[in-house]
Regions:
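Surface-exposed, charge/polar-rich loops and edge strands
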Residues: 1, 5, 12-15, 101, ...
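Short glycine-rich anion-binding loops that position phosphate/pyrophosphate groups of nucleotides
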Residues: 50-53, 119-123
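Conserved residues at the C-terminal ends of beta-strands
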Residues: 48, 117, 175
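Short linear sequence motifs
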Residues: 32, 127-128
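Short polar/charged helix/loop
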Residues: 131
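Aromatic side chains
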Residues: 39, 48, 95, 121, ...
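N-terminal active-site beta-alpha-beta segment that forms phosphate/nucleotide-binding
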Residues: 1-109
């Protein structure tokens, strides 16, 4: 399935979600992430600060920020910088995303677990992002466990057409499914 068709279909499905459904899905997905060894064992975790149309990470960030070292991406040209998450030091950055202030840049190689946002995933861990390649470029330099999260309809049955630069995730978690990529 072509990436642009997937982006259109997922956008339409998202627009039908109620606030209640959004909250329930986020709770269920992050409850399961918490119980996974990959999360329990990891201390340095790259999260994302959710946009309104993404599975919300707000509650989860708040719940665990005292016990894990969370990091967030910050757009820097065509690349993503990685900085520590501190609730008091966020500003609205590129694309209206809340991003960390300061210059405490962290090496991607020091991150143990990455929660990777996407428009959709297939059962092989392939992903469709927002089409700017930010995560693909960053993930190319990482050996961390990569976890995709989303609503049920963001896990699609058809295989996604991949390009050579696409980096798959190891695990996809949705409300009803946990998919582990075969290696
Ligand atoms: N929460 C969150 N943070 C993230 C990402 C993400 O997908 N989600 N990113 C993942 O890469 C990076 C930012 N990349 C982004 C790329 C495009 C758009 C976006 O809104 N695109 C519009 C098109 C508008 C335009 O071209 O200016 C769109 O999708 O409709 C947002 C973020 C880093 N931080
Ligand atoms: N490692 C890379 N090096 C150079 N260019 C890249 C790399 N990865 C992706 N790109 C470029 O980024 C653009 C978008 O790629 P693609 O459509 O796969 O993004 P995406 O997976 O939807 O986005 P994202 O990775 O931000 O979630 C393409 O033009 C691609 O050539």
């Amino acid at each position: 399935m072509k990436k642009d068709d997937i982006r259109r279909t997922v956008r339409a499905r998202k627009s039908l979600l109620t606030e209640n459904e959004k909250a329930e899905a986020a709770q269920s997905v992050f409850d399961r992430l918490e119980q996974m060894a990959a999360f329990m064992m990891a201390d340095r975790i790259l999260m994302y600060h959710s946009l309104p149309d993404e599975l919300s990470t707000r509650d989860f960030l708040g719940k665990w920020s005292g016990r894990k070292h969370f990091f967030l991406p910050r757009v820097n040209g065509v690349n993503l910088d990685i900085l520590p998450y501190e609730q008091t030091r966020l500003h609205l950055g590129a694309f209206e995303i809340e991003e960390p202030d300061g210059n405490d840049l962290t090496d991607i190689a020091d991150i143990e677990l990455i929660i990777v946002p996407a428009v959709a995933y297939d059962r092989h861990g392939n992903r469709v992002g927002r089409g700017k390649g930010y995560y693909d470029r960053m993930l190319a330099g990482s050996r961390a466990t990569k976890v995709g999260v989303g609503y049920d309809f963001q896990l699609i049955d058809d295989a996604i057409d991949t390009d050579s630069h696409d980096v798959p995730v190891d695990i996809v978690i949705t409300q009803s499914h946990t998919v582990i990529r075969r290696r």
